Amino acid sequence: MKVVVAGQGAFGQKHLDGIARIDGVEVASLVGGNQESTKAVAAKYGIPHYTGDLAEALAQPGVEAAILATPTQMHAKQGEQVMRAGKHVEIEIPVADTLADAERLLAVQKETGVIGMGGHTRRFNPSHQYIHNKIVAGELKVLQMDVQTYFFRRTNMNAAGNPRSWTDHLLWHHACHTVDLFQYQTGQTATVAHAVEGPMHPQLKVSMDMGILMKVPNGAICTLSLSFNNDGPFGTFFRYICDNGTYLAYYDDLSDGKNNKIDLTGVAVSFDGIELQDREFFAAIKEKREPNASFAQILPAMRTLDKLDKDMGGSPRA
């Protein structure tokens, strides 16, 4: 299967690392903004074609699908472009930064009949899969999720510490992970959702601190704290408080409430959530089925984000 990866930055390269471990998939073209860095990344991964034009990449012989790891503000437009070209698409989280654009992506997916998937990685991290499997088996019920998403980003840098050409967003990007995961793990949509935000950064023009509270009909609650001001370990730290144990998840690692590490061997074929996410995308294409984290399945998360956005009076997007 020949695919296009759009985005030569930190996250695009995470996808390229994962795809390199998946048999039967070849990256036919890499799309990037800065052509010098795009050329270098293409050479590093042995990709035969690179370009700054998504349409040119999609037109390469045999291309069936595209993975978009481009700036958030480009996701909706590029996603529609890929689908209207008759190609399957996986869009990194968030698929859009408005509910209207997310709804449009789903409408275009239904119209074209291609597969459309969001890069909701937390559904695929072995740590969260372990919890989900126990929930599905009736062995566990989430009572509360306590989550902290922390970075130190007072300048516009990406996950690799390089200058970023776009501005990240606590609500529409980082909160999207936890909002979706909370609703996925409880199997319900939040009926109570409130958010507050701290001051805007004078240059970045986005909130640097945010707090979110959610509740689903079965009574489970979620407390989410987010910050770009935290001078410490970065990433998202999840505490699952359940009826039958407490669990601490950090990316692909899991421990119990007393910090005893849990062996995740056998949960999935890899310990890399990005790779597992991409495996699901390619499997759905081959098997002609709806993927986990399809545009339809993630729309409830986008609706909750829209509710939270309105609760804060419409948080500015850079």
Annotate each predicted stretch with a short phrase:
Residues 1-45:
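N-terminal Rossmann-like dinucleotide-binding module
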Residues 45-108:
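Beta-loop-alpha module in the N-terminal Rossmann-like domain of NAD(P)-dependent dehydrogenases
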Residues 122-196, 201-202:
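Predominantly a Rossmann-like dinucleotide-binding segment in NAD(P)-dependent oxidoreductases
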Residues 173, 179-253, 279-289:
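Contiguous beta-strand/loop segments that form the cofactor/metal-binding neighborhood of enzyme cores
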Residues 104-121, 140-145:
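Rossmann-fold dehydrogenase core element
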Residues 65-68, 217, 281-318:
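C-terminal helix-rich "cap/oligomerization" subdomain common to oxidoreductases
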Residues 33, 267-279, 293:
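Active-site loop of classical SDR/Rossmann-like NAD(P)-dependent oxidoreductases
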Residues 51, 91, 116-118, 249:
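Hydrophobic residues in well-ordered beta-strands that form the structural core
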